[in-house]
Amino acid sequence: MIKIKRKTAPPPVEQDSDSDSSFDEEEPQDLEVQEGPVTDSSDEEAASSSKKTAKQGEASEDLKEEDDDDDEEENDDDDEEEDDDDDDDKKTRIPVLNPLSWMRNKEQRLALYKKMKKEKHKKKMQERRARRKAGVPANPGHTIESLREKDQTEVANLNDSDNEELQKELQLDDFSSYFERSYEPKVLITFADNPVTKTRKFGLELSRIFPNALVKIRNKSSVKKICKSAEREEFTDVVIVNEDRRKPNGLLVIHLPNGPTAHFKLSNVKLTSDIKRDHKEITKHRPEVILNNFTTRLGLTVGRMLGALFHHDPEFRGRRAVTFHNQRDYIFFRHHRYEFTKEGKRVKLRELGPRFTLKLRSLQEGTFDSKTGDYAWIISNKRHAMESRRRFFL
C-alpha cells in the first residue's frame, strides 16, 4: 500500500518594493512517497466495517427482491380482484336507457312504443318457430311445485317393493275393512246449531254426491252424542258442516267406529244454482271417485278417508265423476258428467256442482275428542308465518 506525505510550506518572505517583478514564482512542494503496509488501526476498522456493510447490503438486497416479488404477486391478485369488481360494477351500475323516456311528444312516444312492442313480439315468434323446427323443447320455468321441498314420507309408487312396510300398515289401518269390501258406506250429514239456508242447501247437495247418505238436523246435540247414535244406527261416517257469518266455513269428517277424525277448512263454496246448473241433471248412479296428487303418508291417509265416503263399486252407466285434486295442500272438489258426441269419438265434461275447496286443519286419532284426543297432525301456524312456503304436507 502506498502512503503519501505532504510537507508543510515555509513561511512567506517579505519582498522589497524595489523588486523588478510584482509576482514571485512559488516554489514547488515536495511529495514523499512511501511504500509498505499500513499499520494504522483506524484503517483496519474501516476495512472490516466495509466488509460487514457489504454483506448486510447483499442480504438486504435479497430481502428486498423477495419482498418485491411478494408485492408483485399481491398487486397482481389485487388487480384481478379489482378487475372482477370493475366487471361487476359495470354489470350492475350501467343503466338501461329507454329511448322512449327522451321523447316529449306523446303521440310519437306512443307510436314508437307500439312499433317496439310489435318488433319484440315478432322476434319472439321467430325464435319459437325456429325452436319448434329444431325440435328443442321449451323451457318450462320454475313453479312452486317444481321447487317443492322433498318430504321424507313421500310415496312414489305404492306397489313398489320398497314400500312393503307401508303396504302392511295400510292392511291394518282403519280403512282396511272398506277396501276389503266388507261393508257398504253409510254417511250421516248434519250441521251446526240453527243452520242458515245456504248451509242447509250445501248439506242437501252433499247428500246427492255421497251415495247412501242421510241429512238430519243436529238439534243442539254434542258431537260425541251424535257419533254414538250414528254408530247405533250403523252409520260408517259422520259429516258435520260448520258455518260462520251465515256461510259454511268448515267440514268435520268422522270415521266410525274408531276414527280417525279430520277437520277441514271450507272455502269458495259454489252451489249448483250458483254455476247455473239444475240439480235434476244429477242422477242417482254411484259416481266414479278420482283422488289426485296425494303423495305423502299423511296425504295417503286423507285420500283414503275421502274415498271411503263413496261406494267402492261405481256405476259407469251414469257417467258421473267426482274429483278430489290436491294442489299445494288445497283439496279442490269438482263434480262432472262426461258426455260423448254423436259419433262417439270425442268426450267432453259438464260440471254439475257443487264446487268447493278444502284445507286440512287437523287429523285426530279416534273419534272426535277436543279435550283428551291425540292428534296425528295439526297445522302449526298461519301460512305466512310458516318456516317455508315451499313445504307441503299432503
From Swiss-Prot:
In which residue ranges is the amino acid composition biased (Basic residues)?
Answer: 116-134
Q: Name one Pfam family in it.
A: Brix
Q: Which residues pair up as cystines?
A: none
User: Region (RNA-binding) spans which residues?
Assistant: 347-364
Q: What is the predominant subcellular site recorded for this chain?
A: nucleus
- Supply the alphabetized keyword list: Nucleus, Ribosome biogenesis, RNA-binding, rRNA processing, rRNA-binding
* GO MF terms, alphabetically ordered: RNA binding; rRNA primary transcript binding
The biological process GO terms on file are: maturation of 5.8S rRNA; maturation of LSU-rRNA; ribosome biogenesis
Which compartment or compartments is the protein found in?
Answer: Nucleus, Nucleolus
> Which residue stretches belong to region Disordered?
1-98, 116-152
In terms of PANTHER family, this protein maps to: RIBOSOME PRODUCTION FACTOR 1, U3 SMALL NUCLEOLAR RIBONUCLEOPROTEIN PROTEIN IMP4
What's this chain's function? Answer: May be required for ribosome biogenesis.
Provide the protein name.
Answer: Probable ribosome production factor 1
